[in-house]
Every structure is written in C-alpha cells, then in structure tokens.
C-alpha cells in the first residue's frame, strides 16, 4: 500500500514527486510517456518562470525531470484505465484507492494526486477536416519542415501568437486565423511588428482540404466566404482536460476540469488535483509547480490525521 500515487509526469506531477520524496513518502509517479514532460514541452519560449530569463518549454521540463532523477525518483510508464475508492473498514486504514492500468496491473494507495493535465483539441472539433489534411500542434517540433514556405496557425491565444513568432523566423509568411484574439497584449504587439506575420481576426474557419500539395482553408469573414492556401498548418485552439479516468464521484466543471481548492483538495477525501486539470484562472508552468507542491503537502497532512 502506497502513501500516494502521482498520476502525471508534467510539471505538476514532478513537483509533487519532489515534495513527496522530501517528506519521505512511499509513492510512485506514473506517466503515459516516461520521456514526455507534459504540455510544457510544446512551448517555444518560456519567459515568465522566476529565476529563468528565457528557455524552451522542453528544456524547462527536462531540467525538472533531471532533478527528480538525481533524487532517485523513477517515472513509471503506464496508462490509467480507472480509479476506484474502496472502503476498507480495518483498524489500520478506513479507505484507499485502487488504480487500474491498461496493462492489467494495479496499484493500491491511501491517496492519489491526479495531475494528468490536458490534451490538444483537434481542428475537427471546430470545422470540417478532410481525411487527407495533415496539421501540427508543435511549431518547435515541426516548424523546420516549412523553411521558406507559407504556413498558417488557427487559434488566438498566447500559444498561437508565440508559435507564430517562432515560425516567422523559418517560414516565408505566417497567417494567424482566429475568431477572437485572447493573447497577451505584449505578444500581440510583437506579432504586429513582425513583417511576415498577418492576423485574420473575427474569422470562423469552415473547412480544411487539400488541392495538389497545398492545404486550403475556407473561412467566413464579415459574412463573406474566403479562402487561403498554405504549405503547412498548425493548430493552437486549446486543450481539453483528461479527467475521464478519475472516480465518477469527483466533482467537475461543465468543461470537465476537476474542482479543487488551492491545497488540491477535491470533494473526495484523499483525492487531490494538480496542474492544468484543476479548474483555475491561470494555467502556467509556475502555477502547475505550485499545485504539485501543495498537493504533496496536503497528502502529508492527511496521512497524519488518518
């Protein structure tokens, strides 16, 4: 029986692991991909993490992974299938969690720190995408494929604008197509000052299809159906929470984010939530790290009382 099982090896999960190790808890950290460091690895540039002037998301996440490895913490690669809370009614423990994995194995733990984060939304959720259309989620990973070519990014948030700036140094032209700009004003200013980036705002993407070797984007702008053609396409329309593995009793928002307070406590005793999966106003690397630390501390306090 473990003290806690940490599900997720992004910044929130790894932060929880650091604090769990320092508290001498008996725990495991589980990740679907042991070599991944979560959504942060797709960030082209992180400039708002205290103490670090500028770093790629992958390098930031990897430095944290190196830190936990130096502490002797090993990420175990497994995919969660289900989590069940079980009433024990023994002298030693009154309740515990059974975590079942797709490989048929199970873990039993007094608590769970759920930090599985979110995954990219697909463009098929907002428009018609033909089967032969290929697009990307990561500019830093796939941007070099389009050196000197024309690319487009669908999305209006910080990710879209940051990746546009990165792609502007590789591609010939970059077009941002969005129904609403929600990126920070500093990013918007940088994009507007970059000559080979254009922004098509208040546009509704209707369909994506191929003609010869090009990707065609049909969109509605001011009630007029327009068309643009590019060599490469990137998606930055947000993410959806991976909350479908948690116990059915756990309260969630309408969008599927788990309801938890600043200590990570949910409506289920012993079940804690950290990182992007938690309903909150700000989802950043720094808030994910804080969530993980708070959850590990909450586990320590919970175990003292149980």
Put a short name on every predicted segment.
Residues 1-7, 23, 35, 42, ...:
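FAD-binding core/adjacent interface of flavoenzyme oxidoreductases
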Residues 5, 22-41, 176-184:
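Glycine-rich FAD pyrophosphate-binding loop
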């Amino acid at each position: 029986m473990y003290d806690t099982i940490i599900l997720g090896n992004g910044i929130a999960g790894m932060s929880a692991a650091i604090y769990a190790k320092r508290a001498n808890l008996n725990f495991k950290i589980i990740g679907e991909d042991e070599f991944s460091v979560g959504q942060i690895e797709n960030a082209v540039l992180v400039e708002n993490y205290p103490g670090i002037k500028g770093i790629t998301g992958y390098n930031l996440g990897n430095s944290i992974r190196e830190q936990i490895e130096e502490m002797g913490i090993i990420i175990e690669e497994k995919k969660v299938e289900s989590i069940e809370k079980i009433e024990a009614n023994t002298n030693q423990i009154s309740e515990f969690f059974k975590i079942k994995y797709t490989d048929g194995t199970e873990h039993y733990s007094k608590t769970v720190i759920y930090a599985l984060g979110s995954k990219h939304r697909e463009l098929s959720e907002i428009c018609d995408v033909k089967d032969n259309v290929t697009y990307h989620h990561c500019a830093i990973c796939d941007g070099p494929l389009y050196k000197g070519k024309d690319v487009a990014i669908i999305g209006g948030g910080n990710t879209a604008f940051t990746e546009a700036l990165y792609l502007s140094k590789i591609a010939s032209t970059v077009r941002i197509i969005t129904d609403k700009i929600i990126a920070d004003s500093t990013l918007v200013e940088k994009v507007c000052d970059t000559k080979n980036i254009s922004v098509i705002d208040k546009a509704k993407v209707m369909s994506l299809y191929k003609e010869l070797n090009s990707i065609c984007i049909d969109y509605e702008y001011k009630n007029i159906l327009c068309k643009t053609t590019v060599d490469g396409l990137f998606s930055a329309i947000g993410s959806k929470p991976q909350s479908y593995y948690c116990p059915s009793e756990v309260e969630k928002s309408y969008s599927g984010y788990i309801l938890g307070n600043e200590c990570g406590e949910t409506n289920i005793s012993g079940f804690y939530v950290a990182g992007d999966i938690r309903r909150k106003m700000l989802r950043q690397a720094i808030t994910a790290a804080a969530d993980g630390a708070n959850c590990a501390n909450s586990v320590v306090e919970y175990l003292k009382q149980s």
